[in-house]
UniProtKB/Swiss-Prot annotation:
It catalyses: a 2'-deoxycytidine in DNA + S-adenosyl-L-methionine = a 5-methyl-2'-deoxycytidine in DNA + S-adenosyl-L-homocysteine + H(+). Belongs to the class I-like SAM-binding methyltransferase superfamily. C5-methyltransferase family. The keyword Cell cycle does not apply. It comes from Lactococcus lactis subsp. cremoris (Streptococcus cremoris). The keyword Nucleus does not apply. It is an enzyme of class 2 (transferase). Residues 2-360 form the SAM-dependent MTase C5-type domain. The gene is scrFIBM. GO terms for biological process: DNA restriction-modification system; methylation. Disulfide bonds: none annotated. PROSITE patterns: C5_MTASE_1 (PS00094), C5_MTASE_2 (PS00095), SAM_MT_C5 (PS51679). This is Type II methyltransferase M2.ScrFI.
Length: 360
């Protein structure tokens, strides 16, 4: 049984991939700070939708104290704790979710001596300060940027020495501005005895029709165990296969009959590298924004343009509708968009895990 710890867990795409790959495993703990994300994780993986109706003998202050102790939930931009702002069912949901998730909370506050043993450590650390579409503040150790949280993983890796590690982040991690820090981290892992294998994998090469390139780094502690990245697969799905047939009018742009010149295709698409969000077609045409919009082109060259629905964005990440449905009961559409954009494409992980754990 593979024992797994998910740092920067999100809604658990790694866990979904392990399940899809039929790899026996146990999640012994996670680290995640965002409240809505934790609700999604618990709804998908830990039966929160039923557990939330059970009685709790703790007072509101006792539940808040528990959350504060693991520094949850945090405002992702300011790292301000928001537990005092929770009340009623929202507070109860957050408390139950964190207990069910075995969430150790803010990675900066984790004492690795208090963590259970595990074989596999995943750490898809924040990309906002690395991404071309992000802030470009970098990931220098102790710089205080969100991407510099990568270095908080060192204490865990060094103390627990899991056999397998998996890092994931945007392609720009190995670009000219950040490659030096990426290499520095790899050298650190090598000093602990790890052998590192990294490559850039694209979602379209693993069954999902979107051009989403990400850096994956596999590190193995056993020097006698090799790793080869999975081979590319033929793409059989089209974008149309993942779109909903009947979409609410609220997803269509109000001033949507816009065109400067005809475009001779049935649909237009554009996929943001980090964050799913609707945009005006004018912005798309002027290339100011790179979000995905879709609309069937009329004969006169006009476009009834709309945003992708939250469900569609999760489909483009390889998440099944049943799991989306569980999460959507508890969190807003805005959060659902953000969660999918910050996650990892499940079929890519599935192929990678099948190769990594083929002897399991």
């Amino acid at each position: 049984m593979l024992r797994v710890f998910e740092a920067f867990a999100g809604y658990g795409s790694q866990r979904l991939a392990l399940i899809k790959a039929n790899i026996p495993h146990e999640i012994v703990g996670i680290s995640e700070i965002e409240g809505d994300v934790l609700l999604s994780y618990s709804a998908i993986h830990e039966n929160l939708l039923e557990e939330r109706n059970k009685n709790i003998k703790l007072t509101d202050d006792e539940m808040r104290d528990y959350l504060k102790n693991i520094n949850i939930p945090l405002d992702y931009k300011t790292f301000e704790n928001r537990a005092d702002k929770l009340g009623g069912q929202k507070l109860k949901d957050m408390y139950i979710a964190n207990k069910l998730n075995k969430n150790f909370g803010d990675i900066r506050s984790i004492d690795p001596k208090k963590l259970p043993d595990f074989d596999f450590f995943t750490y898809s650390f924040p990309c906002q300060d690395i991404s071309v579409a992000g802030y470009q503040n970098g990931l220098v150790a102790d710089s205080g940027t969100r991407s510099s949280l990568l270095w908080e993983c060192c204490k865990i890796i060094e103390h627990k020495k899991p056999k397998y590690l998996m890092m994931e982040n945007v392609k720009n991690l190995v670009g000219k501005n950040h490659k030096v820090n990426f290499n520095k981290f790899l050298l650190y892992l090598e000093s602990l005895g790890y052998t590192n294998y990294w490559d850039i994998l694209n979602a379209r090469d693993f069954g999902i029709p979107q051009n989403r390139e990400r850096v994956f780094c596999i590190s193995i502690l056993n020097p006698n165990e090799d790793f080869t990245f999975p081979q590319k697969q033929n793409l059989t799905l089209s974008m149309n296969d993942l779109l909903e047939e009947n979409v609410s009018e609220k997803f269509y742009l109000k001033n949507n009959q816009v065109s400067d010149e005809p475009i001779l295709q049935d649909y237009i698409y554009c996929l943001d590298s980090n964050y799913w969000k609707g945009t005006f077609l004018k912005d798309f045409l002027s290339k100011k924004r790179r979000q995905l919009v879709s609309g069937k082109v009329r004969p006169d060259g006009k476009y009834p343009a709309r945003r992708l629905t939250p469900r569609e964005t999760w489909r483009f990440m390889g998440v099944e509708d049943t799991n989306f449905d569980k999460a959507s009961i508890l969190v807003s559409n805005t959060s659902l968009y953000k969660q999918s954009g910050n996650s990892i494409v499940v079929p890519v992980l599935e192929s990678l895990f099948k190769e990594l754990f083929k002897s399991q």
